[in-house]
Amino acid sequence: MSLSDWHLAVKLADQPLAPKSILRLPETELGEYSLGGYSISFLKQLIAGKLQESVPDPELIDLIYCGRKLKDDQTLDFYGIQPGSTVHVLRKSWPEPDQKPEPVDKVAALREFRVLHTALHSSSSYREAVFKMLSNKESLDQIIVATPGLSSDPIALGVLQDKDLFSVFADPNMLDTLVPAHPALVNAIVLVLHSVAGSTPMPGADSSSRGMPSSAYRDMPGGFLFEGLSDDEDDFHPSARSTPSSSTPSSRPASLGYSGAAGPRPITQSELATALALASTPESSSHTPTPGTQGQSSGTSPMSSSVQSGTPITNDLFSQALQHALQASGQPSLQSQWQPQLQQLRDMGIQDDELSLRALQATGGDIQAALELIFAGGAP
């Protein structure tokens, strides 16, 4: 085969229906070396030159071949890439700067957690209001916007999207573990308490938050009072929909202990996409805890041992707690739901369907985000 026949097929991972692009390797660059002498970094430069509109910078792409993410310092020969092979291009985005969670006032947070924990167990309307808000995507997005550090904490995001886990973590006994390990989750839970308190009557009278006007809840970050929900879901407390006064100073829950800007910062598209992709849980569990069943549910949960012992919450422990929900969703139905994306991942050489299904479910079927999750640990 002559040097002029050396070519590769290039396909963008996020455009599965687009035709492949043929990349012919320049003969003058080869010299006495074969195609296999090219480095992956040089191949990226060639691809960026070929696909200038789609790939403006070679530093913003990863290359995938036979299910492996290619390292810049290796050669085509190292990965066994032959003429006519198809290389998949995974486009990256610039990483957003990490945000530090706001400090937590543990005394104030303990008081808020006690109010929330009591309300969840004694008021069915309050419990329903909390879980309706958390299962609504717009409301969850607003919580992410209003809570610095939440988008980069996958465990916290997962807890907010699972009813049983939320009930376990909203226990005041969890604070000693949550404050150092997941402060953003503590702040988010407090925001949930205040947001729902503005639209649904609290069952207990011993709460510092009850005396706050609804306008204060609405003005605070996270105090969105079901604005993302439909009108039929907003009937818990009609009077709470009064228009806030523009002159009313905004306030925040005391547990946040932060004197910065009260309004939510603008959230970037990549930050929100990453946050949602990392929330590797179903949208909600099929069972809403009730006062009669909650104790049994939390008692049998894999998280219950950590509640009693106060041990740190690890990713492995969190994954075990979510396994029941993943199994309940049914593997056959998942395979049917994500069949096109599964096939695309197989075409890239990723043959572990179970791994692919977990990544697809965590990202809502976003093939780009699923690939980033799969390769988060680096090339095998």
Swiss-Prot record:
Q: Which GO terms describe its cellular component?
A: cytosol
Query: Where would I find the UBA domain in this sequence?
Result: 333-377
Q: Where is the Ubiquitin-like domain?
A: 18-98
The record's subunit annotation is: Binds ubiquitin. Interacts with MAVS; this interaction enhances TRIM21-dependent 'Lys-27'-linked polyubiquitination of MAVS.
Spell out the Low complexity composition-biased ranges. Answer: 239-255, 270-312
**Keywords from the named record:** Immunity, Innate immunity, Phosphoprotein, Ubl conjugation pathway
SUPFAM superfamilies, per database record: UBA-like, Ubiquitin-like
Where does the record place the modification Phosphoserine? 230
**What post-translational events are described?**
Deubiquitinated by OTUD4 which stabilizes UBL7 expression.
Q: Which Pfam families match?
A: ubiquitin
GO BP, one example? innate immune response
Q: Please give the function described in this protein's UniProt entry.
A: Interferon-stimulated protein that positively regulates RNA virus-triggered innate immune signaling. Mechanistically, promotes 'Lys-27'-linked polyubiquitination of MAVS through TRIM21 leading to enhanced the IFN signaling pathway.
Presence of keyword rRNA processing: no
Q: Name one GO molecular function term.
A: polyubiquitin modification-dependent protein binding
Q: Where is this region: Disordered?
A: 201-313
Tell me what gene encodes this: UBL7
State the SMART domains in the record. UBA, UBQ
What is the recorded name of this protein? Ubiquitin-like protein 7
* Keyword Nuclease assigned: no
